[in-house]
UniProtKB/Swiss-Prot annotation:
The keyword ATP-binding does not apply. Belongs to the methylthiotransferase family. MiaB subfamily. GO terms for cellular component: cytosol. Residues 1-21 are annotated as: Disordered. Its cofactor is [4Fe-4S] cluster. This is tRNA-2-methylthio-N(6)-dimethylallyladenosine synthase. InterPro entries: Elp3/MiaA/NifB-like_rSAM, Methylthiotransferase, Methylthiotransferase_CS, Methylthiotransferase_N, Methylthiotransferase_N_sf, MiaB_methiolase, rSAM, rSAM_horseshoe. Monomer. Catalyzes the methylthiolation of N6-(dimethylallyl)adenosine (i(6)A), leading to the formation of 2-methylthio-N6-(dimethylallyl)adenosine (ms(2)i(6)A) at position 37 in tRNAs that read codons beginning with uridine. Binds 2 [4Fe-4S] clusters. One cluster is coordinated with 3 cysteines and an exchangeable S-adenosyl-L-methionine.
Amino acid sequence: MNEEQRKASGQVSSSDKKSEKDYSQYFEAVYIPPSLKDAKKRGKEEVEYNQFQIDERFQGLGNGRKFYIRTYGCQMNEHDTEVMAGIFMALGYEPTNSTEDANVILLNTCAIRENAENKVFGELGHLKALKREKPDLILGVCGCMSQEESVVNRILKKHPFVDLIFGTHNIHRLPELLSECYLSKEMVIEVWSKEGDVIENLPRARQGKIKGWVNIMYGCDKFCTYCIVPYTRGKERSRRPDEIIQEVRRLAAEGYKEITLLGQNVNAYGKDFEDMEYGLGHLMDELRKIDIPRIRFTTSHPRDFDDHLIEVLAKGGNLLDHIHLPVQSGSSSVLKLMARKYDRERYLDLVRKIKEAMPNASLTTDIIVGFPNETDEQFEETLSLYREVEFDAAYTFIYSPREGTPAAKMQDNVPMHVKKERLQRLNALVNEISAKKMKEYEGQTVEVLVEGESKNNPEILAGYTSKSKLVNFKAPKEAIGNIVKVKITQAKTWSLDGEMVGEAIEVN
């Protein structure tokens, strides 16, 4: 609950005791949920840029305490987890890999599909017993699910043992929220329907020293009819270029070999700047001059992928020619229902431009099958587009209605057995083309950024090529964190086996 909601209710104080009798009804009276309707009405209010700092009141709040964060969903959630972990550690908390040892447990959630939400509710069920054993444990739910009013109300009614709920726009207020949890016997809820400002100088506990996430913008204004993200992540807000460039320079100085620029729609970067014309192409053109071997970005929206960005990417160097370009459907009619704001031909024209500028570019995509009203003929159009483009890989999904989105009001009239059959056919095509493209690597020598031991065999090292191909090979452990040359000896559908050739590559 934020301060406005608290003042409006006039019913909550830190000294109140938790009511076991009618707890959920009590909170229904004072809790104002995030509003999807209001999200769609948002205007173009000026975004404020603020610097994060921890109030001296909260210094040492975590001394002698441990935290555990379980992350669901996309790279943005992984990035947010790094930020929250950084805040925890700045407060004096220590990380732990065990829920049993934790004094604070956060579930950083994903709302993109119903299956992701079910996993979180299942985990809450498992943690109920632990909370009963450790009543002083703080159990929190954050991330995109927290921005959905139906989810918050479900937690209030069915999981009243949860201590803390907060959304995606107020991660920077974690110190205040934790302090309130310790002082109050009530569930602490702070979910802002309105997107927050851009907060700089946030601490981060990055996972490893090889690859790093760099957020360049927040939110999405596209409002595709099936997607909950514009509601859970808010309007598009870009970080200032100088802040991003400084962060990338710091990572380069710390020895990172690869960075990925993050945003719900990175191609819209800079469109909200009123004082200058500056887009993703301009940013990439500056970042390519920084001494870091590899720079990627995700996720792209075809609608905003402009010619200037293609021109800059074609300069190569540390700008990788692996582009994730979600198409969602090969049918113009379905794309119109999805409100993607491009049709089949416009997408194919964009692909042609990319391949003309970067003949060796690797393209991957996202595809949804079984969207409302999708016919057999329209699904065949998706298959034909996939064959024409020959994507290196695809993330494929059965359509999942999300409450509050326009598509959820459409009649979900494609039977589940048809959806599953279409997904099976699509995946067969995806596997076929992937195997064909991977086969072309046999006998080639590729550069691999070594990330660590293989998950299946500690004697084998694993890493990725510039085109995101997984490579497994034998090499000394000293190769971890370096870019090495590997000759490919065997291609599989989704990975490559090889032999290390020579020493690690020096990157100047």
